[in-house]
Amino acid sequence: MKSITVICFLALCTVAITSAYPQEPVLADEARPFANSLFDELPEETYQAAVENFRLKRATCDLLSGFGVGDSACAAHCIARGNRGGYCNSKKVCVCRN
């Protein structure tokens, strides 16, 4: 039993050391052509429309409901956005009041 534990520990150490081994640095100029995002390739008017319609997913109600603070966190989130408050609906989505 001790030998299996020692072998597993050595295997774990080997994996940790090899995954932490440094790679060759990549120059920013070489990586730039491959790192274009969709927003970089859009025309200006399409870019503005995409930015205006960009919506972040909200997990305030669903994640914090286990702690009993889902509605309070949703209301605080909505107040921070400039609304009068908010609540969690039956689908666990934060609905902000105007």
Curated annotation (Swiss-Prot):
Positions of the propeptide removed during maturation: 19-58
UniProt key word Acetylation: no
Keyword vocabulary terms for this entry: Antibiotic, Antimicrobial, Cleavage on pair of basic residues, Defensin, Disulfide bond, Immunity, Innate immunity, Secreted, Signal
Superkingdom classification of source: Eukaryota
Subcellular location: Secreted
Position of the signal peptide: 1-18
Any single GO BP term: innate immune response
GO CC annotation: extracellular region; extracellular space
Record's keyword annotation contains Mitochondrion: no
Substitution effect: residue 2 to Q: In forms A3, A4, A5 and A2 from strain Liverpool
Induction (record text): By bacterial infection.
InterPro entries per UniProt: Defensin_invertebrate/fungal, Scorpion_toxin-like_sf
Pfam families the record matches: Defensin_2
Disulfide linkage: 61-88, 74-94, 78-96
PROSITE patterns in the cross-refs: INVERT_DEFENSINS (PS51378)
Family as reported in the entry's similarity comment: Belongs to the invertebrate defensin family. Type 1 subfamily.
Cited function: Antibacterial peptide mostly active against Gram-positive bacteria. Has activity against the bacteria Gram-negative E.cloacae beta12.
Protein name: Defensin-A
Organism: Aedes aegypti
